[in-house]
Amino acid sequence: MGDKEEVLEAVLKETVDLENVPIEEVFESLRCSREGLTTEAADERLALFGHNKLEEKKESKFLKFLGFMWNPLSWVMEAAAIMAIALANGGGKPPDWQDFVGIITLLVINSTISFIEENNAGNAAAALMARLAPKAKVLRDGRWGEQDAAILVPGDIISIKLGDIVPADARLLEGDPLKIDQSSLTGESLPVTKGPGDGVYSGSTCKQGELEAVVIATGVHTFFGKAAHLVDTTNHVGHFQQVLTAIGNFCICSIAVGMIIEIVVMYPIQHRAYRPGIDNLLVLLIGGIPIAMPTVLSVTMAIGSHRLSQQGAITKRMTAIEEMAGMDVLCSDKTGTLTLNKLTVDKNLIEVFTKGVDADTVVLMAAQASRLENQDAIDAAIVGMLADPKEARAGVREVHFLPFNPTDKRTALTYIDSDGKMHRVSKGAPEQILNLAHNRAEIERRVHAVIDKFAERGLRSLAVAYQEVPEGTKESAGGPWQFMGLMPLFDPPRHDSAETIRRALNLGVNVKMITGDQLAIGKETGRRLGMGTNMYPSSALLGQHKDESIGALPIDDLIEKADGFAGVFPEHKYEIVKRLQARKHICGMTGDGVNDAPALKKADIGIAVADATDAARSASDIVLTEPGLSVIISAVLTSRAIFQRMKNYTIYAVSITIRIVLGFMLLALIWKFDFPPFMVLIIAILNDGTIMTISKDRVKPSPLPDSWKLSEIFATGVVFGSYMAMMTVIFFWAAYKTDFFPRTFGVSTLEKTAHDDFRKLASAIYLQVSIISQALIFVTRSRSWSYVERPGMLLVVAFILAQLVATLIAVYANWSFAAIEGIGWGWAGVIWLYNIVFYIPLDIIKFLIRYALSGRAWDLVIEQRVAFTRQKDFGKEQRELQWAHAQRTLHGLQAPDAKMFPERTHFNELSQMAEEAKRRAEIARLRELHTLKGHVESVVRLKGLDIETIQQAYTV
């Protein structure tokens, strides 16, 4: 035992060169065998070598907390704190300690909330990622089983197959060579062939083959682990961070402009005293900075990410949520996503090509060329046709099994029968099997005719071949291949696929089918699912030998308008995504295999479907834990809701910055009104506490793909902010310069105190600003009238509590240090009424802004539309053009002559493409309908009629 421990210690200290010694010495050095380790021995080694994962840097909690105070928005607040304690120390007054303490308190509160929420989000993310932890097939206690890769130890026997990411450094055992992609480690672009005895590194990907291996190094002792210590992590600035920075910079610049104007006017022109001027500058600094913005947006995404995981979509990076919200094209695999991937074979339809052979023999040969364990869907379907799965190996001894790979597209079994003769059977893609057949020229036409016959019924074809191997060795080429027969495979569509596709089209997401099957199969599936039949063979569009008949047509247009692609190879997926992105589409791509990884990485949202390989999961942004398309569409809706919350807040934040800067700047410059900085702090603290609840607000997702439109955010914020600033200016003028409020409501006048120190007027302005500022969130969060869309209960409760506190402060507070005095309940009621009256136009302003930004207002001017245009005629030309275009492009490879209407914005392009797809889908559905009711509904949808205005009666 002691000798064994010493040997393992030597392995741990890397004094033994396990990479280069003969494989038998590896077993001797690791004190293990080809039968694997026992669980007890593995546990002992785990304690010695540690877990098979890289050590994570432990970050100081305190430094992490302080980190939330180190960003541009916090710097502005910290500058305000320095101003309050240093620059404010003048004019015969002591330093502004209360403002200094208030600012520091606000910073600490915000950082604390950020720290707690991010910590919770981090724990939740860690729990989610644990579900995606890489697995390894390992031999323990004489049995193969799937275990977490983290518990592997040197001496374990593992199995590496196509699509696996190698879980640890290992030496390969006997068998056929593997193709290993080491590009992530060495930069080599082409896969490397690795045979028995060769070493494979942790982190590389198996591109072809299947082989067992013995683990020689784990965790930090692997080649990848050592390299990771030498490389510093790079901070990639994502799009979300860029948006956050842009909005923060806009707010900072707005404050800077306001402060410069105040300094220029107050001191050289108005000759104001030093200290009041500093106080006015502090008001702009403290009130204008959206200090809670990073926290609110990060928390919103973290909570949203958790909700997505509950729906079966785990986000590997939270910023994928914004891309998901903006996705307008989804390229979806047919098999397993649109269909069940539960194949069935109709034995009566099997076509036999060799004399003296019946359908049962073809089935048996196909079963022999299948796996009995770790089966894929095809193997399971074929072996399941036998009365007993053991028949597939009855009376034969397996010599060698060739697993499926994307290049050969077939499996093969070499075996010895009871007479000692060697044979080989193979099943796979008909074209590949046909290439093997010795009589290809004689049977090719019939084979293609049968394939086409199957395809017209939506059936895939599987070919079976047989040969004798007289040489008696597994490496020998063998005798001539006999083409035995063709088997039809049916993969039924999911029960919810058709409805989900219709939902997707209604959401502005154009679903394109991606299938490796024949064009006829793709079209038949598209017809059954109601997604249209405007499909093309990808090789004709993107292959090296393009179809001459479409060579002159614009390929990008055909790809953009297509409902799907057939005969797709992995490299075609990448090209399809690339061309769609070049047309400014936000493209999602589903995938499951190792060869899908490049396309998944290229796509804006790479989606690894349920049961995807490790390589596909590694390359994706979102990993599905449930099969089917409905999970993706539900994730789109949830992502849009999350994005809507973030956009609502950013518009609110910009609006508040403008209203504070413009409003208080005008009060200070026109009437020389000095609002106390401490009260702006109170507004900020109450606002931040309330606005945190927006991360769980009830929102209505956008009906179309959404994205960050900074011009819309800034324009809306400036208009809202300017309107609210003028509300405050008008209120101040009415309360200070007129007797309107005392005369109308019988409240006391504020004019007398105004000549002294503005204390009561300051309380009134504080309450007016506090109420309308927080109420604005109800306007920005809704797409229609704010009082129609019910907000989340948390937001309502937070608003009521915050404004109750604000009202009590304004009514009762007599704070000399803050220069305010209670105004009583009468004035509080007047201010609430004033804000309610001026709140109502905010919704109208919102609609006008949206209308102006959409460009439709300018379209009406340009096209000289008049008010007397009838509703049924409005847009008639566009509908007719769309109808004609859909009819022209439904069949064949015809490119559109021109765009249907002048597209002035990317938004219009997205909705147009989705609208066309909806029409093609409705045409496909029309063919399936045999009732008068269904026919009428389809025609109504196709022609864009308003069903509500048509009085019709029909019977089914």
From Swiss-Prot:
Expressed in guard cells, mesophyll cells, leaves and roots. Residues 86-97, 269-277, 670-674, 735-759, 814-821 are extracellular. It holds the Pfam family E1-E2_ATPase. Residues 954-956 are annotated as: Interaction with 14-3-3 proteins. It is a multi-pass membrane protein. Gene3D superfamilies: 6.10.140.890, Calcium-transporting ATPase, cytoplasmic domain N, Calcium-transporting ATPase, cytoplasmic transduction domain A, Calcium-transporting ATPase, transmembrane domain, HAD superfamily/HAD-like. It is found in: Membrane. The active site is at 333 (4-aspartylphosphate intermediate). Its main location: membrane. Keywords: ATP-binding, Hydrogen ion transport, Ion transport, Magnesium, Membrane, Metal-binding, Nucleotide-binding, Phosphoprotein, Translocase, Transmembrane, Transmembrane helix, Transport. SMART domains: Cation_ATPase_N. The modification Phosphothreonine is found at residues 889, 955. Residues 1-65, 119-247, 296-647, 698-713, 781-792, 843-956 are cytoplasmic. Its EC number is 7.1.2.1. It catalyses: ATP + H2O + H(+)(in) = ADP + phosphate + 2 H(+)(out). Mg(2+) binds at residues 592, 596. The modification Phosphoserine is found at residue 938. GO terms for cellular component: plasma membrane. It is an enzyme of class 7 (translocase). Belongs to the cation transport ATPase (P-type) (TC 3.A.3) family. Type IIIA subfamily. Binds to 14-3-3 proteins. The binding is induced by phosphorylation of Thr-955. Binding to 14-3-3 proteins activates the H(+)-ATPase. NCBIfam families: ATPase-IIIA_H (TIGR01647), ATPase_P-type (TIGR01494). This is ATPase 11, plasma membrane-type. The gene is AHA11.
